[in-house]
From Swiss-Prot:
Modification sites for Isoleucine amide: 66
Tissue localization of expression: Expressed by the venom duct.
Residues in the signal sequence: 1-24
Keywords: Amidation, Cleavage on pair of basic residues, Disulfide bond, Neurotoxin, Secreted, Signal, Toxin
InterPro entries reported for this sequence: Conotoxin (IPR004214)
Domain notes per entry: The cysteine framework is C-C.
UniProt name for this protein: Conopeptide Vt3.1
Organism of origin: Conus planorbis
Chief location: secreted
Amino acid sequence: MLKMGVVLFIFLVLFPLATLQLNADQPVERNAENIQDLNPDKRVIKIPVPRRRGPYRRYGNCYCPIG
């Protein structure tokens, strides 16, 4: 009877707790994907555009600062 009680305890208490813990992690992972834009359908390539600062004078192919 003791062996049957241990087996029932494992399958009726411990096993469901382990599976519930795994299911609880899934929404957090989905939220992390949305925050980090890991979804390939919504991913947009962002290329930074260099901005010129201050007064510059063009010399050939180079913009050099004045002063």
